[in-house]
């Protein structure tokens, strides 16, 4: 079965993102196809490479990145939500005159069209 996940909670402070990550791992372990993860609203903080958890905590941002690298899962973040919350790639940083970018490698700034496409091409869309 083909799945897409929507994450609306930040990497830390709520359970949404960590539950979504555990669900993603379980899907893959059971042989399902996870096509994409779409990060929306506060979920865009999952793509901030400046996030620095304590040494005894799981690094969820890097966990998502590994999911992308190892399993080819598309990690799309809503560009409008990201810009409002200060998460930018190099192109947007340049366009906005910012000194640097902070989008974690493996994540892509996307529009809601990426979510619509996932909804049309997947058997299930699960929101956290």
UniProtKB/Swiss-Prot annotation:
Annotated GO biological process: tRNA wobble position uridine thiolation
Keyword Membrane: no
Active-site residues annotated for this sequence: 78 (cysteine persulfide intermediate)
UniProt superkingdom: Bacteria
Gene Ontology molecular function: sulfur carrier activity; sulfurtransferase activity
Record bears the keyword Cytoplasm: yes
Top EC class of this enzyme: transferase
GO cellular component: sulfurtransferase complex
Pfam families with a match to the protein in the record: DsrE
Predominant cellular place of this UniProt entry's protein: cytoplasm
Entry keywords, A to Z: Cytoplasm, Transferase, tRNA processing
EC number: 2.8.1.-
Compartment list: Cytoplasm
Function: Part of a sulfur-relay system required for 2-thiolation of 5-methylaminomethyl-2-thiouridine (mnm(5)s(2)U) at tRNA wobble positions. Accepts sulfur from TusA and transfers it in turn to TusE.
Family note: Belongs to the DsrE/TusD family.
Subunit relationships: Heterohexamer, formed by a dimer of trimers. The hexameric TusBCD complex contains 2 copies each of TusB, TusC and TusD. The TusBCD complex interacts with TusE.
Protein name as catalogued: Sulfurtransferase TusD
Lineage of source species: Bacteria, Pseudomonadati, Pseudomonadota, Gammaproteobacteria, Enterobacterales
């Amino acid at each position: 079965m083909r799945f897409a996940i929507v994450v609306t909670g930040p990497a830390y402070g709520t359970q949404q993102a960590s539950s979504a990550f555990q669900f993603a791992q379980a899907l893959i372990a059971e042989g399902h196809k996870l096509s994409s993860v779409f990060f929306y609203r506060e979920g865009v903080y999952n793509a901030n490479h400046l996030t620095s958890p304590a040494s005894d905590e799981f690094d969820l941002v890097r966990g998502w990145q590994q999911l992308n690298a190892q399993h080819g899962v598309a990690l799309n973040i809503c560009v409008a939500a990201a810009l409002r919350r200060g998460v930018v790639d190099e192109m947007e940083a340049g366009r906005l005159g910012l000194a640097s970018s902070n989008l974690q490698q493996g994540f892509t700034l996307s529009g809601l069209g990426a979510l619509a496409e996932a909804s049309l091409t997947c058997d299930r869309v699960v929101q956290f």
